[in-house]
Amino acid sequence: MAKVTGLGGIFYKVADTAATQAWYQENLGVGGEWGAMFPFKNDDPEGFTLLSPFKADSDYFAPSGQQFMINLRVDDLDGMIAVLAAKGIEILGRQDEEYGRFAWILDPDGVKVELWQQLGGAPV
């Protein structure tokens, strides 16, 4: 039987695509002609991508007013936070859990971006 094998992309509307792509390139080091592309590798059996709905009244995406949030995997959360803070980007918060370390920022369109350094395997 055919099955879904992973997340193919996140697509959303913004007022100025060039400015948004430039911001992601300059501040997070991701981007290109078609946006941020991440090669699919399956060399880490513990790695995973999550598609997760939130309740309509959840405040987890705050202070963004958007109906979605982008989660980006990082390999060094402390290093990423230092780079972003040096560029004047506000770090909205930090949190460490047994399954990962998190920090949050807003992109220039007001979209909340969750930076995630995975610790351990997928939750059971």
What feature does the model see in each segment?
Residues 63-88:
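Mid-chain, well-packed structural core segment of small domains
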Residues 2-5, 11-52, 86:
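Core segments of cupin and vicinal oxygen chelate
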Residues 1-12, 29, 33, 81-124:
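Vicinal oxygen chelate
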Residues 37, 71, 102-104:
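Conserved hydrophobic/aromatic beta-strand scaffold that supports enzyme active sites
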Residues 9, 59, 66-69, 99:
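Generic anion/oxyanion-binding catalytic loop in active/binding sites
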Residues 28-66, 106-108, 112-120:
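Conserved short beta-strand elements that form part of the metal-binding/catalytic scaffold
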